[in-house]
Design a protein with these regions (language model features):
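Intrinsically disordered, low-complexity polar regions and short flexible loop motifs
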Residues: 29-242
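N-terminal non-cleavable signal-anchor helices
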Residues: 15-18, 78
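C-terminal motif of bacterial Sec signal peptides marking the signal peptidase cleavage site
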Residues: 24-28
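Bacterial N-terminal signal peptides that target proteins for export
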Residues: 2-16
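Alpha-helical transmembrane segments
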Residues: 19-23
Length: 242
């Protein structure tokens, strides 16, 4: 063996240590757990009939001691194809349950508690899929949930500054109670939300002017006003995105 290919004992030791360190490093990398993106979920309580409730998803408490007119912030739960959602009285006792709820990684959903038209003292439970991507540049997305059982169908206006409701075109006409919710995109500007019983201008709910700059995604819950006839409804707005 010539001198160019000969390795001394010290060099062999260094090479062996380096090889061992590399092997341990690779093993450590292989044992790092893979990150799994969670699913985001919240609760929208629109039920007059239901008592104060707690809501758990896969055993995780998402909302505690909430009642009608509440829209909670999103909470994170592990993604799954078959989540179990439990609604219990805040004082104890199971009220309702849904199983096999798909909660995809990175998705946003809402547990939706409503009154049951077929049972005046009962309530219904469902899960809505929420938009998780910002509205297009220069646009805003709105979804309206009509649960104003006594008022019935409503007309929804998004009125630009300087325009009156008499000169405005409804964004939605005759939105039914419990109708299938979809997002509607509008051009972003300063608008006033006005909601009236279908076919009339008064009585109405009128919001303060809202400045929309683009990208907003909102869910608007419409409920009966319990103490007044004018406005006939009350409104709760949640930020889905931005």
């Amino acid at each position: 063996m010539n001198g160019a290919s000969r390795m001394t004992l010290p060099r062999l030791a260094v090479a062996a240590v380096a090889a061992l360190a590399l092997a341990l490093s690779l093993t450590a990398c292989e044992n790092v757990p893979t990150y799994k993106q969670p699913s985001l979920i919240r609760v929208i309580d629109a039920s007059y009939a239901a008592p104060a409730v707690n809501v758990t998803v896969e055993g995780t408490l998402i909302a505690g001691n909430i009642a009608q007119g509440t829209i909670t912030a999103y909470g994170a739960v592990p993604a799954t194809t078959a989540a179990l959602v439990n609604i219990t009285q805040a004082t104890g006792g199971l009220l309702a349950q849904i199983s096999d709820v798909p909660l995809a990684a990175g998705s946003q959903s809402s547990v939706f508690l409503t009154d049951n038209p077929a049972a005046p003292n009962g309530f219904a439970l469902g899960v809505l899929q929420d938009q998780q991507v910002a509205a297009a540049t220069g646009h805003s997305a709105y979804r309206f949930l009509n649960q104003a059982v006594n008022t019935g169908p409503v007309d929804v206006y998004m009125i630009p500054g300087g325009t009156t409701v008499a000169n405005a075109i409804p964004l939605i006409t005759a939105l039914p109670v419990g109708g299938t919710p979809t997002y509607i995109n509008i051009i972003s500007e300063t608008v006033t939300l006005v909601i009236t019983p279908t076919g009339v201008i008064k009585p109405s709910y009128t919001s303060p002017p809202t400045s929309l700059t683009g990208g907003e995604v909102r869910t608007v819950l419409i409920l009966d006003s319990q103490l007044t006839s004018n406005p006939p409804v009350v409104v709760f707005t949640a930020n889905d995105v931005n």
